[in-house]
Structure formats: C-alpha cells, structure tokens
Amino acid sequence: MERTEVPTSQPAEDDLGTADGFSRWVRPHWPAMVRLAARYSADADDILQDALVAAWRKRAQFDPARGTARTWLLAITADQRSKAWRRAARTLSRPWADPEAGQTAGEAAREATSVVPPELRLDLRRAIGRLPAKQALAIDLHYYLGLGISDVAAVMRCPEGTVKSHLSRARDRLRTQLGDDYR
C-alpha cells in the first residue's frame, strides 16, 4: 500500500491561537480524520465536530517533540470515535458494525481499486466491524489510512509492539472469520 506524505511543518505557536491558523494547521490532516471517523460509524459528522472542539481546546497541549500534528489529531479523532461507540453500545447493539454506514467517496474509490474481489469486500468490512475496538482501530489506521507502525502507536498511545500484537491478532481473527476465501 502506498504511503501518503503529509506536510509536517507546524504553524507558529501564536498562529494556533487563531481560528484561521488552527484551520490551516488541521486542513492537511482533515481527509484522514474524516476517513477514520467514517469507518463503521454513521455518526461521523458528530465525531468530527467533537474531535475539532477537543483539538481546539487542547491545542496548547500539542507538543511536536512527542509526535506529528497528524498523529495528534488522529488520536483525538480515535478517542471521539471510541466515545461515540461506547454511547451507541449503551443504547444499541454495535451499530458501527454496519458495513454500509459512513462510507466516504474516498473509501468507495479505494474499494474500486482494491485487491479484494468485490464479492468479498462486504464480508471483510463486516468481519472488521466484529473485531475488538483496539484491533479494528489498528487495522483502520494501518491498512485503510496507510499509517506506519510508529504512527499507529502514536495515535493509539501504546508501544509499537502492542500495535503489532493488535494487528497480528486482528489478522488471525479475520482469517478465522473469513475462512479460505481470503488466504
């Protein structure tokens, strides 16, 4: 999978304090935030709004020495997605497992050029939706958003070895769920 390079330059500290500066800072990372929020969630707009509000409120806490703007913003988006899942789980039975919910145009385009045959994509999306939340997040970040292991670790706030374990366990579960069609 091709990795997309994202600008890593950071705005001046005082520039983050303005709405325009903050907007310019978020803009290059927005498509990845949208894709992450939209995976298996019909509440993507709410998740994104909550993520932006949280990022705005916490902007003074951003430390470029601890990670990139991309990983920081994706971590906030992942947190908001998890909160939305927990809220939904209290009232419904795993609504994010609906493979048709929240598909973005970019995701549809990726699926059109995917190496997974069309008749198996829906099964794969459903199977990923049944994974434990951390395993599904690791799969989404690494395989769908194209983040490297170190960036996934930064987003998930865990060691790289833990990310590798989540990915390995997720692949094992997916193989078990999907059978020989995906080998």
Question: Which ranges hold each PLM region?
Answer:
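Sigma70-family region 2
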Residues: D15, L52-A69, R87-A89
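C-terminal flanking helix
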Residues: W30, V34, L52, P132, ...
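Arg/Lys-rich amphipathic alpha helix in sigma70-family domain 2
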Residues: R57, Q61, A75-W96, R169
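A short pre-motif secondary-structure segment
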Residues: A138-H142
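DNA-recognition helix of helix-turn-helix
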Residues: A78, S82, M156-D180
